[in-house]
Amino acid sequence: EPYQSLIKSVIFQQLHPKAGKAIFARFLLIFDNKFPDDKSILEKSSIKIKSCGLSQNKLLTILEIASQSANKKLPTSIEIIKMRDDEIIKLFTTIKGVGEWTVQMLLIFNLGRLDIIPQNDLAIRKNYQKLKKLPNPITPKEIGMISKSWRPYRSVASWYLWGIE
């Protein structure tokens, strides 16, 4: 479900993957190791949810996602499949705390879209610099230009760039 993927992406925002996994595991523990539905999140104490290691901003974003899901304002899995990438980005970035990177993670990992390049992802830019032995960091705009030649498989390139140690 897009709802689950959005919440997971919010939890992982701006964190090292190990830290994200630890916080996500504690988040699930609060809900008996099952991904909670929107109603369960809205009924749970905010203090309890935040105790898994979430910042106040991430907590508020998760509560807003759950609220929009409960009010049927988020597309279903069937509806979202029919939407274009730019439509999905536009829709979800209206939620406070959900930026383009968060939606791109949903597009890549939940929807399996193959032509997404998270230009603002620092690991992608640093690892490209490392791979090409460039003396200076590259900008989001530069990786956007470079990645045009990788179409229609920019998501695949992203996976490989994330995998560089």
Regions found by a protein language model. Name each.
Residues 6-8, 49, 147:
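Amphipathic alpha-helical segments that form the core helices of the histone-fold
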Residues 15-16, 20-94, 149-151:
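Alpha-helical ds-nucleic-acid-binding substructure associated with the helix-hairpin-helix region
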Residues 3, 7, 15-20, 58, ...:
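Hydrophobic (often cysteine-bearing) scaffold residues that line and stabilize catalytic clefts
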Residues 7, 62-65, 128:
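Buried hydrophobic packing segments
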Residues 73-75, 85-86, 100-165:
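C-terminal accessory module of base-excision DNA glycosylases/AP lyases that mediates lesion recognition
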Residues 2-3, 29:
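Helix-loop segments that flank and shape redox-cofactor active sites
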